[in-house]
């Protein structure tokens, strides 16, 4: 059974539609002196796009299979994942309850009310604030218990949609990359992705190891040092591989030099990457995920950190709505 057939065994909603574009960034390539391509998961078709929709194809299908009437999830006030979960709930006629934290402890009006937070209101999500997501798995379980007592049938979507089931979405993305690579006759030496809640990274690690085993996958951390992030990626990678009856696991590569000072707080390199991509390519990155990941790619080229000097593929996970929340910093 090939990878596509294994994937087809899992219930899945068709939310993404056709494969997202894979394009060469010609002006950025000239600027960096290296062939750079981009996988446009920022233009998935719902709620201003983003990578979480791939995970929600599997997670929401599971919720419907279980007879849920409510999607429950958690994240930062400016969470792209929560925004996309709320949109999917609206599309499916489900209630959405979101547990939110303010990880950067700001009182900036745009952060508190604009960007992704504004969109949650449009999708009619029920928002509950908490002081901190110190144990999100337990906090979501407690919230689900309360909702059950009120007569709801909740389905807990993990933070970032990141578990073995959600990560199947990025095995599907790996299938698209392999097909598009073959069709365009480009052999990627490296793939770069933001590594946060770890499901996207783990899904690509499993998928690319099966399909493009010679391609290096680099996860640029957005919230943790390698010592803390590595077990998260490996845990999902292992569970995902088990669910697909895959024995061989690729080693995980992480770069943690680009997320300081902390998750959700912009830095100079990330903001410079946002400006560069906007001005060179008309592509919008964000200050939390893709801007910092692109800063890693740019510095990785400059410092010759990649395994070899072939074409690099950047996975654009989305997040542009957060630009409005971080004004005037951006």
Curated annotation (Swiss-Prot):
Enzyme class, UniProt record, top EC level: lyase
Catalytic activity from the UniProt record: D-cysteine + H2O = hydrogen sulfide + pyruvate + NH4(+) + H(+)
Keyword terms: Lyase, Pyridoxal phosphate
Matching InterPro entries: ACCD_DCysDesulf, D-Cys_desShydrase, D_Cys_desulphydr_bac, TrpB-like_PALP, TrpB-like_PALP_sf
Enzyme Commission code: 4.4.1.15
GO annotation terms (biological process): D-amino acid metabolic process
Modified residues (N6-(pyridoxal phosphate)lysine): 52
SUPFAM superfamilies: Tryptophan synthase beta subunit-like PLP-dependent enzymes
Any one GO MF annotation of this record: D-cysteine desulfhydrase activity
Cofactor needs: pyridoxal 5'-phosphate
Pfam families recorded: PALP
Function of the molecule: Catalyzes the alpha,beta-elimination reaction of D-cysteine and of several D-cysteine derivatives. It could be a defense mechanism against D-cysteine.
NCBIfam families: ACC_deam_rel, PRK03910.1-3, PRK03910.1-5
Subunit structure comment from the entry: Homodimer.
Family: Belongs to the ACC deaminase/D-cysteine desulfhydrase family.
The protein, known as: D-cysteine desulfhydrase
Protein species of origin: Serratia proteamaculans (strain 568)
Lineage: Bacteria, Pseudomonadati, Pseudomonadota, Gammaproteobacteria, Enterobacterales
């Amino acid at each position: 059974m090939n990878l596509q057939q294994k994937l087809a065994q899992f219930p899945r909603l068709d939310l993404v539609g056709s494969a997202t574009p894979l394009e060469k960034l010609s002006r950025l390539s000239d600027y960096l002196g290296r062939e750079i391509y981009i996988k446009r998961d920022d233009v998935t078709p719902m709620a201003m796009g983003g990578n979480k929709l791939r995970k929600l194809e599997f997670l929401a299908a599971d919720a419907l299979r279980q007879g849920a009437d409510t999607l429950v999830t958690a994240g930062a006030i400016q969470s792209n994942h929560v925004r996309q979960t709320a949109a999917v709930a609206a599309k499916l006629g489900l209630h959405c309850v979101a547990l939110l934290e303010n990880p950067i402890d700001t009182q900036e009006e745009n952060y508190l009310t604009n960007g992704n937070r504004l969109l949650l209101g449009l999708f009619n999500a029920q928002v509950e604030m908490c002081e901190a997501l110190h144990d999100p798995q337990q906090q979501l379980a407690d919230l689900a218990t309360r909702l059950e007592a009120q007569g709801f049938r909740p389905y807990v979507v993990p933070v970032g949609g990141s578990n073995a089931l959600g990560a199947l979405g990025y095995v599907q993305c790996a299938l698209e990359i392999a097909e598009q690579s073959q069709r365009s006759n480009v052999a990627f030496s490296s793939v770069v992705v933001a590594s946060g809640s770890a499901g996207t990274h783990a899904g690509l690690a499993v998928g690319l190891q099966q399909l493009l085993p010679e391609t290096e996958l680099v996860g640029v951390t957005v919230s943790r040092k390698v010592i803390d992030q590595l077990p998260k990626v490996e845990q999902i990678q292992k569970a995902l591989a088990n669910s697909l009856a895959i024995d061989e696991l690729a080693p995980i590569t992480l770069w943690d030099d680009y997320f300081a000072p902390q998750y959700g707080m912009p830095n100079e390199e990330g903001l410079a990457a946002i400006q560069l991509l906007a001005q060179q390519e008309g592509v919008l990155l964000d200050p939390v995920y893709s801007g910092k990941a692109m800063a890693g790619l740019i510095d990785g080229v400059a410092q010759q950190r990649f395994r070899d000097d072939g074409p690099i593929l950047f996975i654009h996970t989305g997040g542009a709505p957060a630009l409005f929340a971080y004004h005037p910093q951006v």
